[in-house]
Amino acid sequence: MISLVNDGRPRVMAHRGASYDRPENTAAAFAEARIQGADWVELDVRLSADGVLMVNHDAHYADGRPVRQVMACDAPADTLNLAEALEACEGMGVNVEVKNLPGELDHDASDLVCEAVAGLVGA
């Protein structure tokens, strides 16, 4: 179990990085979270068309394209894959939220996304 305090102070988790100051779920947001003293970062993952775990909150990118239908190499420029995000969050804990809701465009009834996250995080 993880302690909710660190050196006598509550642990701070940055939701999608420092998303008030930088674009959410980006390397800049994670770096700013570290600068601001975050202990943890929460981020969201979805599967791309070519099976890469991409860090994005919604089922669609901001430009309207569905994450599940876009190859990782064609994602918006500041979009990270999970491996890149974990590297950007080095030194902080990471809470990976798997977006897998029934009724959403990218719902994964076979839990392949969960298995992929577990495989990458456990590596």
Regions from the PLM with identified roles:
Residues 1-123:
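Phosphate-group recognition and catalysis centered on beta-loop-alpha active-site segments
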